[in-house]
């Protein structure tokens, strides 16, 4: 396999995927501007309404990862499929094919070029139960994150307020590495347009989504990984976490 920390890759992808299916309740600090708070509340309200109507979702994505100390960002693209509760298919198609499949707590990471599949439990690979609970709809983002207006630019396309999610817990690998998440939504539909994951190390992974389609009746077989007979199965490392 490529020399990637797949526990970090899976953790980042799952946080991103869960943010595509947000279950939000507003929480913010007292010192934030009242006008900004009002706008954030409205975005959260619309996101909640969208979530409640969405049973499955598919989209194209472009990912740009900026690594601290490297001049050029890494760009990739592909497709993502999500179905409640707890099903995810995340396909990288360019510049190379790499697939992540999640069925509740079971995770498979398949790289056809290397004829290997990494298998494990999400709660072990992500060092936290939060991504699994969020993907299954059993938890709210506000239970893991404080939600507040985004400083600086503050607004996205169409003048819609950006949301910043700040981790409440610094326990586990995910809690120690993730500094904040910034969400941008599409005007009118309030589907997620962009998600940016900022790490304490200075690394930034940004995902932009397009061609979103919801409630298409995605079948369970779409989320089943079919492997050739000659693929080597590798067990994922177990991380200690909450």
What do these predicted regions represent?
Residues 75-77, 96, 103, 176-180, ...:
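Short, surface-exposed coil-to-beta transition loops
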Residues 118, 140-235:
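Gly/Pro-enriched, hydrophobic low-complexity segments
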Residues 24-72, 227-242:
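N-terminal leader/targeting segments and the immediate start of mature chains
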Residues 1-6:
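N-terminal secretory signal peptides that target proteins for export/translocation
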Residues 10-22:
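Bacterial N-terminal signal peptides
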Residues 79-130, 205-206:
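An acidic-aromatic
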Residues 67-69, 87-88, 96-99, 109, ...:
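Short beta-strands and strand-coil junctions in structured, solvent-facing domains, enriched
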């Amino acid at each position: 396999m490529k020399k990637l920390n797949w526990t970090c890759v899976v953790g980042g992808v799952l946080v991103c995927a869960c943010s595509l299916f947000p279950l939000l309740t507003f929480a913010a600090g007292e010192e934030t501007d009242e006008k900004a708070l009002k706008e954030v509340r409205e975005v959260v309200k619309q996101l909640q309404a969208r979530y409640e109507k969405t049973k499955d979702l598919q989209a194209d994505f472009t990912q740009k990862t900026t690594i601290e100390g490297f001049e050029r960002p890494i760009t990739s693209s592909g497709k993502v499929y999500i179905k409640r509760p707890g099903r995810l298919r995340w396909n990288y198609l360019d510049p190379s094919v790499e697939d992540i499949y999640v069925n509740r707590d079971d995770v498979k990471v398949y790289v056809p070029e290397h004829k290997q599949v990494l298998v494990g439990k999400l709660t072990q690979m992500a060092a936290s139960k939060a991504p699994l609970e969020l993907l299954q709809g059993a938890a709210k983002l506000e239970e893991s994150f404080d939600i507040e207006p985004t400083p600086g630019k503050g607004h996205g396309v169409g003048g819609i307020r950006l949301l910043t999610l700040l981790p409440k817990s610094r326990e586990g690998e995910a809690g120690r590495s993730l500094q904040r998440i910034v969400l941008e939504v599409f005007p009118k539909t309030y589907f997620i347009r962009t998600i940016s994951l900022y790490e304490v190390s200075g690394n930034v992974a940004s995902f932009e989504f397009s061609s979103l389609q919801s409630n298409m009746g995605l079948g369970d077989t779409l989320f089943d990984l079919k492997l050739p007979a000659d693929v080597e199965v590798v067990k994922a490392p177990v991380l200690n976490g909450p």
